[in-house]
Amino acid sequence: MAKKSMVEREKKRERLVQKYAAKRAALNEIIHDQSLPMEERFKASLKLAELPRNSSATRLHNRCQLTGRPHAYYRKLKLSRIMLRELGSFGQIPGMVKSSW
């Protein structure tokens, strides 16, 4: 199980990303719009740089919802391989059955 502080840090980052997503998108639109004057685009890039670093989506790291494990993460289920196997063995994931041939 991951440290609680790491899990909480990741949750804080997720909240920041959601909070600043619209503002970031608007500033990026201005920065990449070639029809606007260079000065206006530069001001937008400075405003983007003033936003918190943790508000960038690239700072997020996928973690297991149950354990907080950052490695071997299955995006569809939001679980690590260990919890996927454990819950699958107990039949707690709908449609998942143990393989036998």
Swiss-Prot record:
Q: Which Pfam families match?
A: Ribosomal_S14
Which PROSITE patterns does its entry note?
Answer: RIBOSOMAL_S14
Would you identify the family this protein belongs to, as annotated?
Belongs to the universal ribosomal protein uS14 family.
Quote the InterPro entries the UniProt record gives: Ribosomal_uS14, Ribosomal_uS14_bac/plastid, Ribosomal_uS14_CS
Q: What is this protein for, i.e. what is its function? A: Binds 16S rRNA, required for the assembly of 30S particles and may also be responsible for determining the conformation of the 16S rRNA at the A site.
Q: Which domain of life is it from?
A: Bacteria
- Which keywords label this protein? Ribonucleoprotein, Ribosomal protein, RNA-binding, rRNA-binding
What Gene Ontology molecular function terms does this protein carry?
rRNA binding; structural constituent of ribosome
One cellular-component annotation, GO:
cytoplasm
Q: Name one GO biological process term.
A: translation
Note the NCBIfam families from the entry.
PRK08881.1
Subunit comment: Part of the 30S ribosomal subunit. Contacts proteins S3 and S10.
What's the protein called, per UniProt? Small ribosomal subunit protein uS14
Q: Keyword Repressor on this protein?
A: no
- For the keyword Ribonucleoprotein, the answer is yes
